[in-house]
Design a protein with these regions (language model features):
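Conserved catalytic helix of short-chain dehydrogenase/reductases
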Residues: 1-11
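Short-chain dehydrogenase/reductase
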Residues: 5, 59-62, 66
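Short, flexible catalytic-loop segment of classical short-chain dehydrogenase/reductase
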Residues: 10, 19, 23-33
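Alpha-helical segment proximal to the catalytic Tyr-Lys
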Residues: 10-14, 71
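Conserved beta-strand scaffold in the Rossmann-like NAD(H)/NADP(H)-binding core
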Residues: 16, 21, 77-79
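A short C-terminal helix-loop "cap" of Rossmann-like NAD(P)-dependent dehydrogenase/epimerase domains
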Residues: 33-47
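A conserved structural motif in NAD(P)-dependent oxidoreductases
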Residues: 47-58, 69
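Short C-terminal tail/terminal secondary-structure segment
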Residues: 63, 74-86
Length: 86
């Protein structure tokens, strides 16, 4: 996905079309909550912010990337994961 984002951004920039990707971490949705509690605890040890994301936090990044504020942003993958490492 990262390479596709970069390639498409180069091809479509001539047409003033921006292409970006969002790489979310674990988000507190029904899918995220279906992860067994023991696994969730281990996963949280890799998140410096100490919690999983909220759907609205991912949506806010989408809104930013679609707005004029991101008019010079293309070919990027934005990691929205609370600083996840590991």
């Amino acid at each position: 996905m990262i390479t596709l984002t970069k390639v498409l951004s180069k091809e479509l920039a001539r047409s003033n079309i921006r292409v970006n990707a969002i790489a979310p971490g674990v988000v507190d949705t029904e899918m995220g909550k279906s992860i067994p509690e023991e696994n969730r605890k281990v996963m949280l040890t890799h998140v410096p912010l100490g919690r999983f994301g909220e759907p609205s936090e991912i949506a806010n990044v989408v809104l930013f990337l679609c707005s004029p504020l991101a008019s010079y942003v293309t070919g990027q993958t934005v990691h929205v994961n609370g600083g996840w490492w590991g």
